Amino acid sequence: MDEAIDISKVIGNEHRMNILKILSTGPHNVNELAEKLGLPFSTTAVNVKKLEDANLIITELVPGRGTQKVNSKNYDRIVIDLFTDSTEKEKNVITIDMPIGEYVDCQVEPSCGLVSESDYIGMQDDPRSFYEPGRREAQLLYFRHGYVEYRYPNRIPYGKKAYEIEFSLEICSEAPYHKLDWPSDITLWVNGIEIGTWTCPGDFGGQRGFNTPEWWTIYFTQYGLLKHWKINQNGSFLDGVQISDVTISDLNLHDKPFVSLRIGVKEDAFNAGGINLFGPNFGNYEQGIIMNLRHNE
């Protein structure tokens, strides 16, 4: 976390961000940077040094008119994990990251499809493809209407009681190609109980997702939003905001050897804008559908 603070201080400066933008187009020396920025050489050199000290750029000696120093960008992206020590050491929590292709039931309507890290799975816009054995390799799945359902193993220790269950997943709407303004009413069910509906604002593309493979055209869906559903004794919450009065007691978690999760768009949804679900090798977040199930000691 200390390193993240140091890097944030370095890039929290307009001149240094502009230097990184210029270096995204290719290597430059300080004179070239100063000219493009319209800044004095000395000011540019100071900012270059700060970026170099933070390991955000590298400086190399290259032959030219004599020998000159040339700066290059060292990273295309920076990821900061915001997990605290208390989260990392949390006890009495069962965490399962479910691959998006491991659903046990589905009912989907076109436009629909599944995509692995390297190719399409089955045929596009053909619901039969959702039953292909290769679906387990899916890193992106999408459909306009319907649902997919997952079953997590129920690992609550005998004699213990669950007090909170949480699901996190990267998700967005499903439009032709992509469309930022394309609302979709997405509903979540746990153990057959409707938890609530969230209206996703759009289907996001035009800018490549951090983990989206290069072969996947930029005009298609690229990334989603990371959403967190949480159910405890106080009710059901989406990103910390209560969305229903369903409590964890209503889910009867101790009655079955599994915990079911259904994600879908209802037939009568006001905004029937579909769903895209992302795996770790598509979108912006390296995860499937994570369940955190907390129980007493």
List the predicted regions and their residue ranges.
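Beta-hairpin "wing" of winged helix-turn-helix
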Residues: 55-64, 69
